[in-house]
């Protein structure tokens, strides 16, 4: 699973600069083609969202909803960076999951 994550600041900056962005009320998605046959995921949650407990909860919800929808007709070969907005701090799993799927469909990655 380590190779499926975007970890370095340089990799995040590359996706921000070269990628295309899509957004809704809860999340922002940056998408950029990569040279691998796998999708790599990065999650960013600002301190504006809340204290560390809240930020980590939002991160876990995003990662889990992505993991559970990974096998369902998703195109491969993209770097995906999800950024949580302030309004995501009090949402539950279903809200985050529907926002995530909505963004993936907007980007044309999820069928």
UniProtKB/Swiss-Prot annotation:
One of its GO terms (cellular component) is ribonuclease P complex. It is an enzyme of class 3 (hydrolase). The keyword Transport does not apply. One of its GO terms (biological process) is tRNA 5'-leader removal. Keywords: Endonuclease, Hydrolase, Nuclease, RNA-binding, tRNA processing. Its EC number is 3.1.26.5. GO terms for molecular function: 3'-tRNA processing endoribonuclease activity; ribonuclease P activity; tRNA binding. Pfam families: Ribonuclease_P. It catalyses: Endonucleolytic cleavage of RNA, removing 5'-extranucleotides from tRNA precursor. HAMAP family: RNase_P (MF_00227). Consists of a catalytic RNA component (M1 or rnpB) and a protein subunit. RNaseP catalyzes the removal of the 5'-leader sequence from pre-tRNA to produce the mature 5'-terminus. It can also cleave other RNA substrates such as 4.5S RNA. The protein component plays an auxiliary but essential role in vivo by binding to the 5'-leader sequence and broadening the substrate specificity of the ribozyme. PANTHER family: RIBONUCLEASE P PROTEIN COMPONENT (PTHR33992:SF1). Belongs to the RnpA family. This is Ribonuclease P protein component.
